[in-house]
């Protein structure tokens, strides 16, 4: 059986990266929440 997690740096950046987050309203809310919480890393 094939495992569900097949790591790829490119896909990770495209799906969860900073620019992907900034491109949607919801993503911007995610970043705002992580900033408010004081997260060191905002995105992948």
Curated annotation (Swiss-Prot):
For whether the record's keyword set contains Cell inner membrane, the answer is no
Which Pfam families did the record assign?
Ribosomal_L34
Q: Where is this region: Disordered?
A: 1-44
Q: Which GO terms describe its molecular function?
A: structural constituent of ribosome
Any idea which UniProt keywords this protein has? Ribonucleoprotein, Ribosomal protein
A biological process term (GO) from this entry:
translation
Q: Which Gene3D superfamilies match?
A: 1.10.287.3980
PROSITE patterns the UniProt entry points to: RIBOSOMAL_L34 (PS00784)
Superkingdom in the source lineage: Bacteria
Q: Which GO terms describe its cellular component?
A: ribonucleoprotein complex; ribosome
Bias (Basic residues) occurs at: 10-19, 32-44
Q: Does the keyword Cell membrane apply?
A: no
Q: Give the protein family.
A: Belongs to the bacterial ribosomal protein bL34 family.
Instruction: Indicate what this protein is called per its UniProt record.
Output: Large ribosomal subunit protein bL34
| Organism encoding this protein | Sinorhizobium fredii (strain NBRC 101917 / NGR234)
């Amino acid at each position: 059986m094939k495992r569900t997690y097949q790591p790829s740096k490119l896909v990770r950046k495209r799906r969860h990266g900073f620019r992907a987050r900034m491109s949607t309203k919801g993503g911007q809310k995610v970043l705002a929440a992580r900033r408010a919480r004081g997260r060191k890393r905002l995105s992948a």
